[in-house]
Amino acid sequence: MYEQNSFEAKLRELIENHPSKEKEIRPWGGFITLWSDENFKVKILLVLPQKRLSLQKHKFRKEKWVIVEGEALITKGNKKFIMGEGNTLMIEKEEPHRIENRSKDKILKIIEVWMGEKLLEDDIERIEDDFGRV
């Protein structure tokens, strides 16, 4: 079993050393923007072991997820299910969703594609959050 601090250090190193100018560390892990255009944005989400993003929805964008490494517990609407490497999922505008990394020893990596009329980080309505950001 690995220490959470070693995962946080590894994640910080991955994000800080990436050449992208748009990257951020969050309480659940972090993200790196790989490409941004007028109508779409491509990011990689890095979710720390035993962490999850807020249960959230978006007014102006839909999202497509591709699990590239690890296994995720997904909440989509009122359904929960497991997705593994290679699985994809579409999240529609206004649809509540969440990603959770249930692994104890692996960073979850997801490619996230935003599509919509406004592609802003603040297009988020948090419904539930482990870090007090609701």
Language model features by range: what are they?
Residues G77-P96:
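Short acidic-glycine-tyrosine-enriched beta hairpin
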Residues Y2-I25, R98-V134:
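Double-stranded beta-helix
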Residues P19-K57, R61-K62:
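A short glycine-rich, His/Asp/Glu-containing loop-to-beta-strand
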Residues P49, F60-L73, G77-N78:
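Glycine- and acidic-residue-biased ligand/ion/polar-headgroup-sensing regions
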Residues L53, K79-F81, D123:
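Short beta-strand segments
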